[in-house]
A protein has these predicted regions:
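Non-heme Fe(II) oxygenase metal-center motifs and adjacent flexible, charged/small-residue loops
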Residues: 1-210
């Protein structure tokens, strides 16, 4: 299904209600303009991709070891974020002030999802990262599934291109999130065919991992 202006307006109204079911979550459907999205994708695609996972990724700031336990290794500090990423990280911190000690977003994970690819349901490593997680979507729309770790309540959220998700409080620590490995999403009775999607996850690395 193509997302027209009318469809997007209706979806935003639905999403506003759905997001309220997840305490600590903020959703900005059009955080980045179409031009900003295109510029970011162009920059990202000029960088080298790693095939560490079953999908392409890029890591900046610190390397996160993707495993069952997950860890950030201080010895694998990659240096400061590149200018394009640092600029966006500072913008996020201004728009949504951090309450942590350092108040600096210093780790970025870029994921590329081709149609049919997804990620397991998870909570971002609690001892590794601060209390605010930022997720930006570029390219295709996609449904992300939030599951309460205790009640198992499920809340699907449609991530629109250029959208921003902010996870704090219960949304950060109690709700798992993941993306099914599918080429098609169903949301609110409508079908959305996936194309290439790139996500940016900004986080703050905690001591003693630095």
């Amino acid at each position: 299904m193509l997302i027209t202006n009318q469809t997007e307006s209706n979806l935003k109204n639905v999403l506003e209600l759905e997001v309220k079911k997840i305490p600590g979550m903020k959703y900005v459907a059009d955080y980045l303009s179409v031009n900003q999205q295109e510029q970011l994708l162009n920059i990202i695609d000029q960088q080298s991709w790693s095939k560490e996972l079953d999908r392409n990724i890029q890591q900046y700031g610190y390397t996160y070891q993707h495993s069952e336990t997950g860890a950030v290794v201080a010895s694998k500090h990659l240096g400061n974020l590149p200018d394009w990423a640092d600029c966006l990280a500072k913008q996020l911190a201004r728009d949504f002030p951090l309450t942590s000690t350092s108040q600096v977003l210093d780790q970025l994970l870029v994921n590329e999802y081709q149609p049919g690819q997804g990620c397991k349901s998870h909570i971002d490593c609690v001892p590794c990262f601060g209390n605010t997680i930022f997720l930006i979507s570029l390219g295709s729309q996609c449904v992300i599934e939030f599951i309460h770790s205790q009640t198992k309540e499920q809340v699907p959220i449609l991530l629109l291109p250029g959208s921003l998700v902010v996870l704090q409080g219960a949304a950060r620590y109690t709700w798992r999130h993941g993306i099914t490995s599918s080429k098609l999403d169903k949301y609110q009775g409508k079908e959305f065919v996936r194309s290439r999607r790139v996500s940016l996850t900004f986080r703050e690395v905690l001591f003693p991992h630095k």
